Amino acid sequence: MLKTTIFAGFLGVSLVSPGFAATQPVAEYGDWRMFVSGAGQSKNCYIAGEPKRSMPKNARRGDVFLIVAHRPGQGVRNEVSVRIGYPFSATSEPFARVGSDEYAFFTGVQVENGADEWAWLETLDDQSRLVTAMKRGNELVFKGTSARGTLTTDSYSLKGVTAAMKSLDAACPAP
C-alpha cells in the first residue's frame, strides 16, 4: 500500500527538478530550493537539493536530486524521494544516512515511465524521522546501485534545510 500511495504522487513531483527548466524555485535556502505547483486539492510543495559530491566521478548519470514533498490534497507530508540519475538495479537496496542513522529506500524498478530512477523511503514512520534528522544534521549520504552494477554515493549538504522546511510547511500546511 505504501509503495502504491507514494508512486501515485510520482508523476506530479517527478516533473519538477532542479535540472528542469519547466518550474522555477519560489525560494532558496542555503543549498535547498523550494517549489510550488498547482492549487487547491492538487497543490504540491517541495524542497529539493542536489548532491555536493558524487562518487564515482566518472559515472554517467542524469539529474540527481533529493526531494521532500507535501501534497495536502492527498494527505501527504514529508515524503522523501531521490532521483538517482540512472536506472536502479532490480537488486539495489538504496539507503540514506544522516549521522549514524540509516533509512532504507525502495526503488521504482518495476514501474514504467522513468520511475526506475527513483527511490522512496520504505516506511511511513521514517519520513518524519528522516526530515527531523535532516534538520539536525550537516550531511545526508545516499547510496544506490545502478542496473550496470555501479555503486554510487551522493553527499547532500543540509545547509538551509530547516528554513526550507519551515517555508514548505507554511506554503502547504497540514489539512
Where are these regions (language model features)?
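Bacterial N-terminal signal peptides
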Residues: T5-S14
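Residue-level detector of intrinsically disordered, flexible termini
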Residues: F7, F20-A21
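N-terminal signal peptide c-region/cleavage motif recognized by signal peptidases
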Residues: V16-P18
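A generic "folded-domain core" signal
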Residues: A21-P175
